[in-house]
Amino acid sequence: MEELQGYLEKDGSRQQNFLYPLIFQEYIYTLAHDHGLNSSIFYEPMEIVGLGYDNKSSSVLVKRLITRMYQQNSLIYSMNDFNQNRFVGHNNSFYSNLDSQMVSEGFAVIVEIPFSLRLVPSSEEIPKSQNLRSIHSIFPFLEDKLSHLNYVLDILIPYPIHLEILVQILQCWIQDVPSLHFLRLFLHEFHNWNNLITPTKSISVFSKENKRLFRILYNSYVSEYEFVFVFLRKQSYYLRSTSSRAFLERTHFYVKIEHLIDIDVCHNHFQKILWFFKDSFMHYVRYKGKAILASRGTYLLIKKWKCYLVNFWQYNFHFWSKPYRIHINPFSNYSFYFLGYISSVLINPSAVKNQMLENFYLVDTLTQKFDTIVPVIPLIGSLSKAKFCTILGHPISKPIWAELSDSDIIDRFGRICRNLSHYHSGSSKKQSLYRIKYILRLSCARTLARKHKSTVRNLLQRLGSGLLEEFFTEEEQVISPIFPKTTLFPLHGSHKERIWYLDIIRINDLANYLDWS
């Protein structure tokens, strides 16, 4: 990283024009496999799957890759032979997949440079905004705002069908023409777009082999559409008073009317758009491929927003967005899945006793409350896919972990359980979370029994029931001085208050699977 920073400081005025030579630098591919870089704010840790190649960068393979990239004849040969799908003419599929993955990861590091240069100064200017990165910081905002709104647009963000759209969007950030040509060649020549993106999923599911590169391309696309969307929203908010002629005060009335007429003449078409979407109670939240657009307005207004979004993606990004990907629902009888929670607005009826002189009477009132619960069935499906239980929720052993030591097995299961408790601490109903913990606990016991070639009962009798005490470290044990326990049972003891932690910067892996499924 220091070498990369030295390169940028050496020629800082032209840093974006000299990104392409970095592709031939060996340290770039070392950075791509560096754990510190992979755990940055941009991406999750990467791994090479299905190739028999570990996460450590091999200098020999990198040097061979750079040598082959220098050979222009083999590059031209590869362009003329699409059916072989071999990087720079290599005939071995192992090296083909491995080379393409190394190139995609290395190029992703290079593409990050313009973005990181924009983000680093802002993080230094606002050091107190660290907690705003927390995923849980979104939910207090939703609790405060959504309970007063009427309708919500549940949006599955569409993805561009053609690769050229992503390359053109990236041109706004990178002016290095050779790098863009190299990216275009890599996308069109060495991969089949239908294999990289699965149309049946809710959003574009990037292959694990090239996750890093394609995620930054997808984020560039999302940033582009949100820039235009937020601009329109801000303009409609700040200029909404220009359409309220009937409510002008009488002081200098005719002068104000003339001023408004001048505005209408200059910006007639744009103001029609602003009036079309006038709504001062509009809130937008997005995470990954899902977004919600909530409004306090009428059904007609929220329907206009839906039509606008469909036309916006069609005319600005030149691809058709299917209307059924955007759902209009009233908050009163609708639940939506977001960030690992099933969220809804509950209506709680209550009666208030009032007294006027000597007469007593009851007044029925309705209060709205934002509610979040743990999705049990999807989480069980996620555990089933991870081989912790069956599809019906019956715990099974984890054979791949049976070769580890007892402490490692308990530590792995315990870490998963504690992370789930930590992430889903904002649930209003903890009973669902207890079922997930029970599955993990019994799966851990069966894995230990499988290792020792025994039964779960004999294992617990021989080692003692306290073997898994550390496995179920409850969240309330940490915050018990603040929130007293509501029950004496250690397995089911939990506070009823919802708690949002500001140290969670990424979604839990089990809940993360739900977001992409």
Curated annotation (Swiss-Prot):
It comes from Trillium maculatum. It comes from the Eukaryota. Keywords: Chloroplast, mRNA processing, Plastid, RNA-binding, tRNA processing. Disulfide bonds: none annotated. GO terms for cellular component: chloroplast. Its main location: plastid. This is Maturase K. It is found in: Plastid, Chloroplast. Belongs to the intron maturase 2 family. MatK subfamily. It holds the Pfam family MatK_N. GO terms for biological process: mRNA processing; RNA splicing; tRNA processing. Usually encoded in the trnK tRNA gene intron. Probably assists in splicing its own and other chloroplast group II introns. InterPro entries: Domain_X, Maturase_MatK, Maturase_MatK_N. GO terms for molecular function: RNA binding.
